[in-house]
């Protein structure tokens, strides 16, 4: 039996530390002792992919071509050409067997595998000590020690996720202050006001006569659920046909409405109702996963590589400050978004609702992830005043210290992409003034005071937040895909090459809500509050049509 075929035994060979997995325990967390050794759990292992450099180069080449002429990779062939190798999966299975773990499932295209077993086996396999922690925000499981594996297999493992169960993301929606009498009372008040998604789409001049037919929009959810009766009630009230909605269970999570409109149900039904109202001809696949680093990644990879539903658009309204993620988790997620770009899947994510700090209290400026990924279309927030079906006024959404504000700023993790080099992205406001990926790319109505009329758990309410902007523009992309007859895919590089009149430039406001210096201001052209501005839908479609004269990056 060769060394490669021989099962590993504890102490048989040196172990190597997997870099990028360190995560400090939360302030105020209290160590409550070890997790019971016979408790069962699962982790997601991310394996290296084949020809990783070739995939990135392919995406870069295709990004320089007009969207209608791009050659996206096919899901059917992706696993063989760019997934993890079958040899690596075989090595992982031997490692699992040797440590008393089961390889429950493998996603060859995504290069991920789920290993499960008792805590004692996980501790031995990865060289950690799993422990329980109590915190004012909730209890969680984490670990002491560095994540290690046998040195011979360390080069093939890029991440081990799921050891820590702390939530990695929060939903980016905010309820409008309630008014008595439902929608009618709100509409009669001077302020605040509310719009239906149809109103907002009209103001942004979404192309008419299109409904997303032939497209599948994936929606990522990390909690809550939707009530079919609520959805039916809502779409009937708008006079639009109810779209087909299916739920997909990931890592044991499922469609589980809580009955609390202000909880995660608010996010789930907001996403479906906004996008569904504007693309009722599309199929909607809602991927439910646990709110952990493993769950979030598995939801993304399941959607992107879904061989049956084949989403062409992915909408994400959950996220967290990029600095709160481990570097291994961010790299794994970003790799999945690269897969999406190669496959022609447009991924959109909310930029956050807590202004230029993204809710952190460390005195620094932060952007939200996954919106910060260069392969994700980051969606910021505005305050929209519409009149006669057109924009009367649009400014940066900022409700001040007692409210919310659009996320935005400069990434401390992702470098400035080539396609933003001429966008005048400022240096980071943090010490060192480093350059980085500018967030957001586009913006749309997000202020709860000018929010969206929706029905959550059977209750009529008004919701804002950048959570609404991701599904709003996901529906726009679905309409454009329908018209083009193919998916536009990775849009970011193209958007920055389009004429300025494709967007409504937003030049008033800032996203500081911490009573500090107003570092990030709106202004002409791209800015770290609203990106390029709000898209003018018909002009964006026209610019992407084959007949358009498109500048090449």
Swiss-Prot record:
Q: What is its EC number?
A: 3.4.21.-
GO biological process terms held by the UniProt record: proteolysis
On pH dependence, the entry says: Optimum pH is 3.9 (for degradation of azocoll). Stable at pH 3.5 to 5.0.
PROSITE patterns xref list: SEDOLISIN
Subcellular location as annotated: Secreted
Activity: how regulated: Partially inhibited by L-alanyl-L-alanyl-L-phenylalanyl-chloromethane, leupeptin, 1 mM Fe(2+) or 1 mM Hg(2+). Insensitive to specific inhibitors of aspartic proteinases, such as pepstatin and diazoacetyl-DL-norleucine methyl ester (DAN), to specific inhibitors of metalloproteinases (EDTA), cysteine proteinases (N-ethylmaleimide) and serine proteinases (PMSF).
Induction info: Constitutively expressed.
Q: Which SMART domains match?
A: Pro-kuma_activ
Q: Where in the sequence is the active site?
A: 267, 271, 467
Q: Which domain of life is it from?
A: Bacteria
Q: InterPro entries given for it?
A: Peptidase_S8/S53_dom, Peptidase_S8/S53_dom_sf, S53_propep, Sedolisin_dom, Tripeptidyl-peptidase_I
Q: Which cofactor does it need?
A: Ca(2+)
Record flagged with keyword Hydrolase: yes
Thermal dependence reads: Optimum temperature is 60 degrees Celsius (for degradation of azocoll).
Q: Which residues bind Ca(2+)?
A: 505-506, 523, 525, 527
| CDD domains, per the entry | Peptidases_S53, Pro-peptidase_S53
GO CC list: extracellular region
Q: Where is the Peptidase S53 domain positioned along the sequence? A: 194-547
In what way is this protein post-translationally modified? Autocatalytically processed.
Q: EC top class, in one word?
A: hydrolase
Which residues are propeptide? 1-189
Record key words, sorted = Calcium, Hydrolase, Metal-binding, Protease, Secreted, Serine protease, Zymogen
**Quaternary structure (record):** Monomer.
Q: What does this protein do?
A: Thermostable pepstatin-insensitive serine-carboxyl proteinase. Can specifically and efficiently degrade collagen. In vitro, preferentially cleaves the bovine collagen alpha-1 chain at a single specific cleavage site. Can also hydrolyze the chromogenic substrate azocoll and synthetic peptides derived from collagen. Also shows low activity with albumin and casein, but cannot use keratin azure and elastin.
What's this protein's name?
Answer: Kumamolisin-As
Q: Gene encoding it? A: scpA
